[in-house]
Amino acid sequence: MNETMFDENRMRIIQEYVPGCQVTLAHIIASPDKVLYQKLGLDPKIDYQKAAIGITTVTPSETAIIMADIAMKASGITLGFVDRFSGSLIFTGTVSEVQAGLEAILDYVKDKLNYTVCPITKT
């Protein structure tokens, strides 16, 4: 649950997570438009040539760091964004690189860390 509270011209954001160790999103965006790269803060000059974006979210959020390492070592992906506070991970590569990175992530966290994982989805 996200809540935004305003107090004397200050904004405070409250994020709450449900207890558990889980990957809640593992998605491949194949052939995304260049605008999507820009809106995500990725450099289309570098990242667009590979033509796929991988997105994951995880709790506990610090696991995103481990997931980034696994994806980089398992395939030729380029790291786009890691947020250890929200558990978001974005990376780019060819469709097969992104697929291999996501599969390696899910296999590791499921088998070694005993996380609950979701299926990989693709658009």
Task: Label each residue range with its predicted role.
Residues M1-A68, M72-F85, T92-T123:
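Positively charged, small/polar-rich N-terminal and surface patches that mediate targeting and assembly
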